[in-house]
Structures are given as structure tokens and as C-alpha cells.
């Protein structure tokens, strides 16, 4: 097994928390109360797990790079190396949305069919759920690794699909997915830093780090590029937290009762995850949905009310962006929703109405749509 990197430095993270508290008053208000008060108010872990993400991505890239030989062997043994096999990305809830952020880019990079499949569907409809073929690779994602569907689905596949190979990506070193299969040569377990195993209800660090860990499958022959991209993403992620937190806090004070998140391609997976986060963090008080920019016209627009927040993850690709801008302008022309929040780079100012908000993210387009999902879900 690959050598495990040292644990992410708590001192490094605390220095960052201090810096962001000093520079951004919104975070100062949250970080400054005594830890016991933060815990009583229920946000102690969530706050840190959101803010630490840019640094955890750097650690995850180093950690995954140590598994290079094992990952190359796994791709070869599963038939993906010579394009005979298929790739399935599985999990439940947010862990499934990890796969939805990755399937298109991994399919393009590996030149094999790649499908996100819910772990529960594998349990109930095994033969229909999996791509046809005798061999393939199944990647199982799990923050805790203890959900009954995840381990049960893996147990089932080990019995019924004996030629398949498996990759487990998990944040919990003591969970079932991390400990139960160590003796099986068909399974490689990649453990992320314990700091990514979110203690709060919602998945934040765990989600983005599992996305970024598995992104390496498509860049395993070019790890220098993988590390360079990680550095760019970490810098943009820090800038989002430093530059836009006041604006986002102001949005949160709006009295919206529902929210819809729009994304294209890989960003639709980010939209799904973001919608779930809003639903969970408001305890269901804000109803949420996610759609593609082109799909929202076909029925879901009827659910956009005067009290609906519309969040748009804008593509950096010219053709994709043209379709997205057309839809956003239609929303403005029809005066739909309470307000729009548009996240992107070089966003045209004519898109917005009074009350709308543009979150400019320099270098976002350079990171690429296929990698920006970790930024959209911060």
C-alpha cells in the first residue's frame, strides 16, 4: 500500500482561520466567540470544515499521488487501461453527487463508459444498473463509509461480479469501507485526511475532497498537471472565501423560501449537491431543486416563485456559456425569482436586475469547467 502522508497540519489551518477572521468581518463574528458558544450554536464544525477546503485539496493531491502505482494497476486490471471495461461511480446522497461531478470528465479522459449509479440501485437492480461487460471498475465514495447501502452494494458486487475491480475513496479511517476489505486484492482503499471527515451534519470538505481525489483517475499519467491544477483551485477557493463572504451573507439574509441551482455538464452535479446543502442547513425550511440551464425551461420554471433564489454556475466554455446566458436573460426579462446569484468569471453585467448579484472569480475559467465543481460547492 502507498505510504500515507502526514496528517494535515492543524497549525496551518488555525493560521488560516485567524487570517480569514481578521480580513472578513463575517467570519470574525463567527470565529470570535468562545468555542463552547460556537458549539452551543451548532456551527463550530461546519464553519471550519467550509473554510479549510482549499488547504485540504492540496493535501488530498499529495495523498492521491502516493497511490499512483496502485491506481495505474487498478485501471489496467479492470480493463479500463485498454478500453475494455467500464467505470461506475457509486454512493448515496452527496456521495452519489461526487460521481455526477466526475462522470463526463473521466469518460473523456479514460475513453470508456462512465456512469454514476446510486448504491441503493445496485442493491435492488444489480444487473440493470451496471453497464454490460465482464470487467470494469467500481468506485465507491463515502464520508463515513458506514452507510448500509455502500458496504452492502460492495459485498454484493464482490460475490456476483468477481472480475470487477474496486476503488474505495473515504474520509473515515475506521469506517466499514476503510477497514472491511483490506485483505481483498480486488480492492484499493484510498484514505483521505481525517480533517476531511466532516463532523457536522452536512458534507463540505468530505464532498470536495472526494471529488478531487477521484479526479486524479483522469490525470494519473500527468500528476504534475494534477498538482498544478490543485494549486490554482486552492487559490481561487481562498479568494472566494475572502472576497465574496460579505455578499453571500447578505444573500442569506434575504427572505427567500425556495432556491434553485443551475449548472451545465459537470456543474449540474455541483448544483445537485448545493441544493442538498441548502435543504439540510435550513432543516427543510427552504425547499430546493437543481436543474441544467437547458432543462429548466421544460417544466421546472413553473416552480420559480417571487420568493425563489436562483443560483447560476456559469460555464467558461464559449458555446456552453452562450446557452446559459440566453436562459439567464430570459429569467431577467420575465422577472422570475426574488434574485439571482451568478458565479463565474467575466460575467456580463447586462444579465442582472436590481438585487441580483455577480460573484466574479478571476482565474475560474483557467481552472476549467471540469474542475470548477469543487469551487461551486464551497
Where are the predicted features?
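Glycine-rich phosphate-binding loops that contact phosphosugars or nucleotide phosphates
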Residues: 4-12, 80-232, 313-364
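Extended, charge-enriched "interface" segments that sit outside catalytic cores
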Residues: 4-26, 32-33, 46
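Active-site phosphate/pyrophosphate-binding segments
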Residues: 49-55, 60-77, 82-83, 181-311
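Peripheral docking tails and interdomain loops at the edges
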Residues: 7, 15-19, 356-378
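Conserved phosphate/anionic-ligand binding catalytic regions in large, soluble enzymes, centered on
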Residues: 42-46, 52, 89, 93-105, ...
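Short conserved micro-motifs at the rims of enzyme active sites and ligand-binding pockets
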Residues: 273, 322-324, 353, 369-372
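Acidic, two-metal ion nucleic-acid-processing modules in DNA metabolism proteins
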Residues: 36
